[in-house]
């Protein structure tokens, strides 16, 4: 099972070093059981998304350790991967970025051909082979259709629940 991390510093730019590297249950420590990829995403001082990821376990990834110590942001998303769908490769490592939003997912969504048919031209947002990135593309499409983030998320989750075999749709 993948592991998710999300943190908001509110109005303040903060570091996530403790939770990513130093805590007894840090993502680096948990990656010994979830070794298939590590990523961290945040936003720079101008609100632009930044994503750093490798198809390596966090405890082995020197760049992850450096990023965890140096990055300062109001919002962090991090993910360690236990691959269920898609190869162990950079393009399948979370978090993903679409239209200036970041996304990481824990769970399994099946019947990807049905999801791809539903996505239509939005499938062009997908660069890897994971169910997660396709799920994010559906959320992105629904947000763009209605212009409301909350309603877009609800609409996408409802479509997935109604049409696809799902084991979990947890995401940050």
Residue ranges and their predicted role:
Residues 40, 107, 135, 171:
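Residue-level signal for inorganic ion chemistry
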Residues 116-142:
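Long, charge-dense
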Residues 2, 101-111:
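Conserved beta-strand-loop-short alpha-helix elements that form
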Residues 24, 55-66, 78-100, 117-121:
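Short acidic (Asp/Glu) patches
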Residues 13, 69, 122, 144, ...:
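Small-residue-biased structural context
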Residues 146-172:
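Catalytic core of PPM/PP2C metal-dependent serine/threonine phosphatase domains
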Residues 7-10, 79-82, 106:
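Fold-independent oxyanion-binding glycine-rich loops
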């Amino acid at each position: 099972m993948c592991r998710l991390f999300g943190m908001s510093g509110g109005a303040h730019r903060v570091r996530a070093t403790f939770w990513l590297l130093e805590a007894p249950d840090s993502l680096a420590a948990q990656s010994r059981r979830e070794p298939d990829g590590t990523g961290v995403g945040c936003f720079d001082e101008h609100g632009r998304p930044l994503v750093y990821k490798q198809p390596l376990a966090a405890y082995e990834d020197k760049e992850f350790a450096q990023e965890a110590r140096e990055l300062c942001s109001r919002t962090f998303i991090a993910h360690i991967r236990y691959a269920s769908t898609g190869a162990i490769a950079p393009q399948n490592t979370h978090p993903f970025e679409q239209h200036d939003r970041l996304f990481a997912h824990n769970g399994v969504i099946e019947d990807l051909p049905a999801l791809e048919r539903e996505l239509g031209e939005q499938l062009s947002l997908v660069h890897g082979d994971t169910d997660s990135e396709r799920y994010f593309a559906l959320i992105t499409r629904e947000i763009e259709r209605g212009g409301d983030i909350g309603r877009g998320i609800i609409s996408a989750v409802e479509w997935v629940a109604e049409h696809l075999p799902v084991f979990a749709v947890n995401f940050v």
